Amino acid sequence: MAKFEIKEEFYLDGKPFKILSGAIQYFRLHPDQWRDTLYNLKALGFNTVETYIPWALHEPQEGQFQAEGMLDFEAYFKLVEEMGLYLIVRPTPYICAEFDFGGLPAWLLRYPSMRLRVNHPLFLEKVSHFYDWLFPKLLPYQSDQGGPILMMQVENEYGSYAEDKAYMRSIAQMMKVRGVTVPLFTSDGTWIEALESGTLIEDDIFVTGNFGSQPKENTDNLRAFMERYGKKWPLMCTEFWDGWFSRWSEEIVRREAEDLAQDVKEMLQLGSMNLFLLRGGTNFGFISGCSARKSKDLPQITSYDFDAPITEWGQPTEKYYAVQRVTHEVFPELEQMEPISRQAKAYGSFPLLGTANLLDVAADITEEILLDYPQPMEQIGQNHGYILYRSDIKNQYHEERLKALETHDRCHFYVNQEHLATQYREEIGDEMLFSADTERIQIDVLVENMGRVNYGYKLGAPSQSKGVKGGIMINHQFRKGWKHYALKFDKEMLAKLDCYSAPPEKVKAPTFYRFEAELNDIADTFIDCSKYGKGCISVNGFNLGRYWNEGPIHYLYVPSGLLKEKNEFIVFETENVKIEELTLLDHPVYKK
């Protein structure tokens, strides 16, 4: 049982303690890789690991909780403790983390009166229910109960969103009444407006900063703010950014190793820090978030490599060794070790075994829901993925008109299973003309949710609700009578997929492609997506995430823990690209 205190310094069992931490997010790594990654943190000479706990993953449907496999944070905490490390836990409702909706569960959007991240009774009620499930699991791991947790965070960068101190106090009180006894803290940018709005310094809750450069300037700001309130607390950077996230259609963001190393060295001399991130990870499934720039949403890529010291696939980089070197220069007494490096394997190419046209099989793989007018996916219990809307109309005119209103994010339109158009961003709402020589016309509208904004003023914007919100007009009238198909790409849906048809000569609709790969000597590998268009890929029923030929990445990472001797890969392609093979490489591929 350890006693962790925050005075003019951090103290652990009465002795001064420097927090040397790295962020390793359990939910973005396969559990098989937790141990090696924690070892590599320890090999730097670091003593602490930091992680968020994403509400959206642990309560995917209201009142339905999960903490198995990749989400088994208790197993992760036990491993941290076994390896002699300490923990900083951020169990906040909102995490940002470049995570869809900032880690908030999408089902919150079903409530019209919901107000996010303020002292709103409905929001607090939902947080309270989650905390009732979460904190009994966390409490035994507190350091004063014999566990590794030193501190827990209240909210996250709140000073960049609002200034509702009553809300902040409600969250802190929820934590305390459920038994949190370790110190609480906040983390914000170090400009005065953020610190005044986002902290509870007046309630003696510890204040930390988030930044990745100019350590002296940022810690001076922190110190001045603390002194204004008569505090002589230690200086701590909770997110010392060593890289950055990347977005579709843009270049990978990089940071030079020496530039980082010198800033890390300066920060270590000034105070404690958490390197964000120590290791990147993967936005498996559809958890990647989205940036917002004025009216334009900019979705983030599947890789959460972050240009971190350890790559998405577990290889220490030049940055890692540079950070290890400067850590030794500042603290030569710390024990350091050679890190573990994971090796990937190329398995070659595998031929196509079968296909399925989504428009033919939608009713077989998911429930058909008939409603008068199109509803966003959240209203039918769907959080992520694609949603298909279908209506059958009488052919009345020589030329028909079609448009979808208030629809997010990317739309594909089909007439009698023939591709009519694809619309994205400002194109949505444009009118399309079509004609057919059949008595009845089948209209299909496939909408892709490309990720919700995770940071800033658009967190609660109407565009966070995905699918068709404003309606679909045919010949200037809102069409009544639409079948809804929620395409979640979960194990249940994929298990129902019959994907054995021969490929068509010409692809005209969204298509599933099935491959099998028999592997010996199983290792990590990479799917080469450079010849594909846009879609997502699953292996053995596990959704690896999105690919897009827009780049900057043209690969999907496959951890060895997802593979076995005989493997089934399903590629879902929306861009009418005919896929004939699946290639597994020993390296990632980037857009040239």
Regions found by a protein language model. Give the residues of each.
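Aromatic-lined ligand-binding clefts that engage carbohydrates, nucleic acids, or primary amines
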Residues: 399-414, 443, 517-540, 547-548, ...
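Structural preference for beta-strand elements that scaffold enzyme active sites
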Residues: 19-21, 48-50, 84-88, 147-153, ...
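Extended substrate-binding grooves/exosites of carbohydrate-active enzymes
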Residues: 1-35, 39-43, 58, 64, ...
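Gly/Pro-rich turn-and-neighbor structural signature
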Residues: 146-228
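Carbohydrate-binding surfaces of carbohydrate-active enzymes
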Residues: 123-153, 164-165, 172, 180-181, ...
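Short hydrophobic beta-strand segments in globular cytosolic domains
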Residues: 17, 420-421, 544-545
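Short beta-strands within extracellular/lumenal beta-sheet-rich domains
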Residues: 383-392, 508-518
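Short strand-edge motifs at loop-to-beta-strand transitions and within beta-strands
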Residues: 391, 428-432, 513-515, 552-556
